[in-house]
Amino acid sequence: MTALTPPQHEAELLQRAKSIAGLTFAELAEELNLVVPPDLKRDKGWVGMLIETALGATAGSKAEQDFSHLGIELKTIPVNQQGYPLETTFVSLAPLAQNSGVTWHSSHVRYKLSKVLWIPIEGERQIPLAERHVGVPILWQPSSSQEQRLRQDWEELMDYIVLGKLTEITARIGEVLQLRPKGANSRALTKGIGKNGEIIDTLPLGFYLRKEFTAEILHDFLMD
């Protein structure tokens, strides 16, 4: 099995995802002629790349959904032995400038979360990378109450950005979404709005889903 062509429809994508559930990273990598790194210190995106390759993801840019022709975003989610998420989930970069007129309905966060294929993966560090397993896929769309909670957080956080209150933003704001610096290092600056409306240099910020929210998604699936 080499890199696959993009799935033509949702059922085909889900079938592919189910077919790799239960495999170890080593088994899946061997099928795809990929080499498993010893760890993720230098290859942070390797697991995502492995799953994307196996499923035939197409997004050349992070701005698009991974399966944009199907309207589906792909997210791997590292979990512990109890199935609880081990980390927050990156959604998209926040628009720190040129953001007038942006609404929840036209936002990148809503676009990215409109339909998500979650792939839980074993993430505990004591398990060697090659021996970690791929989990059962979950195809998810936010319920009306989940979307309402996402929207409330997004609107509150965007108010901070638009009103030039970047220095007041902390990871504690938001019930299900949070804003955190997103960049390889503190030298990777971008343009934002200062408190007097001036353009300033600032750290890029990303929207992240809190672990409690993704845990709820996984729990709801298991209860079905």
From Swiss-Prot:
Its job: Sequence-specific endonuclease that cleaves unmethylated GATC sequences. It is involved in DNA mismatch repair.
Pfam families: MutH
Subcellular location per the Swiss-Prot or TrEMBL entry: Cytoplasm
InterPro entries: DNA_mismatch_repair_MutH, DNA_rep_MutH/RE_typeII_Sau3AI, DNA_rep_MutH/T2_RE_sf, Restrct_endonuc-II-like
Parts forming coiled coils: none
Entry GO terms, CC: cytoplasm
NCBIfam families assigned: mutH_TIGR, PRK05070.1
Cited SUPFAM superfamilies: Restriction endonuclease-like
Name of the protein described by the UniProt record: DNA mismatch repair protein MutH
Source superkingdom: Bacteria
A GO molecular-function annotation: DNA binding
Similarity annotation: Belongs to the MutH family.
GO biological process: DNA modification; mismatch repair
Lineage: Bacteria, Pseudomonadati, Pseudomonadota, Gammaproteobacteria, Pasteurellales
Keywords: Cytoplasm, DNA damage, DNA repair, Endonuclease, Hydrolase, Nuclease
